[in-house]
Swiss-Prot record:
ATP binds at residues 5-12. The record marks 95 as: Interaction with substrate tRNA. Keywords: ATP-binding, Magnesium, Nucleotide-binding, Transferase, tRNA processing. It is an enzyme of class 2 (transferase). This is tRNA dimethylallyltransferase. InterPro entries: Dimethylallyltransferase, IPT, P-loop_NTPase.
Length: 292
């Protein structure tokens, strides 16, 4: 089954109420896959993971780049482990793109020349945005502004002569291409916006109180400020605070706003997807619990 939700909606607290002898969790989250970043990514705690098995959580070093191809391979390995145990895999999705790539297949992107890749790697994030806006303005509407990886990939595709915004995962988006999977239920946790934003604001405050700035600094000291893990949402604000360039009030405001904006994009994404149905937490929990 699929359980999709924006950041802060309460996916983890819901799945910890499931029967661990029947279900295991496969997390599709581009941030929670990193080790030693549990505060800023709100990864399931050790206690929460002890209640029900989670896969694809805290498995990569912050120094490792992640993309849909790597995620697919890791997810396939995890899926087979769960199926071999004769349990029901629950796909929890915050990063809709990775889940969709797993279910529908990968984008048919052209092969990228080394010279093109080197050129893009040498560019700053702003330079990438500006050039992408010139070559393929529609692509920017589909990419989270802080997602440097996808900005780079979109630009590479355009520089190879293809419009990234025109690429399709599958022409028939009403059917899942993983015919080996029996998707019995697809849920999108659809919270009232006011409630969701209040939850996000509280979570941002708790992240700061738990030491997100120190967590970011340790990652920066060990792997460098440009490591892939630190491109995760909000860590730029954590580093700015740790460097003394922002106070706690500014840090909280920036972190909360970035998470609200991210959640808004997630909601927009999942409301357009035909494989999930919007429903409240209580209904979703009951529907999942009674799956056979």
């Amino acid at each position: 089954m699929i359980l999709a939700a924006p950041t802060g909606a309460g996916k983890t607290s819901l799945v910890t109420e499931l029967d661990p002898t029947r279900f295991e969790i496969l997390s599709f989250d581009s941030r929670q896959i990193y080790k030693n970043m549990s505060i800023g990514t709100a990864a399931p705690t050790k206690k929460e993971q002890s209640k029900i098995a989670h896969h694809l959580v805290e498995v990569l070093s912050p120094s490792e780049a992640v993309d849909a191809g790597l995620y697919n391979r890791l997810a396939e390995e995890a899926l087979q482990k769960v199926l071999n145990l004769d349990k029901i895999p629950v796909f929890t999705a915050g990063t809709g793109f990775y889940l969709k790539a797993f279910l529908f297949g990968m984008f048919p992107v052209p092969e990228i020349d080394v010279s093109v890749r080197d050129r893009v790697l040498s560019m700053s994030k702003e330079e990438k945005k500006n050039l992408l806006k010139e070559l393929d303005p529609n692509a920017l509407d589909k990419i989270f502004p802080e997602d440097d990886y996808r900005l780079g990939r979109a630009l590479e595709v355009n520089l190879m002569g293809e419009k990234w915004s025109r690429l399709k995962i599958d022409p028939n988006t009403s059917a899942i291409c993983r015919y080996d999977l029996d998707i019995r239920l697809g849920v999108f946790l659809d919270l009232d916006r006011k409630e969701l934003y209040e939850r996000i604001n509280l979570r941002a405050k708790q992240m700061i109180e738990k030491g997100m700035a120190d967590e970011a600094w340790k990652i920066q000291e060990r792997f460098g400020e440009t490591c892939p893990g630190l491109k995760s949402l909000g860590y730029n604000f954590a580093l700015e605070n740790k460097k003394g360039n922002s106070n706690l009030e500014t840090f909280l405001a920036d972190l909360s706003r970035s998470h609200r904006n991210y959640a808004k994009r997630q909601v927009t994404w999942f409301r357009k997807e035909p494989y999930v149905q919007p429903m409240g937490r209580s209904e979703a929990l009951e529907r999942i619990k009674h799956m056979k």
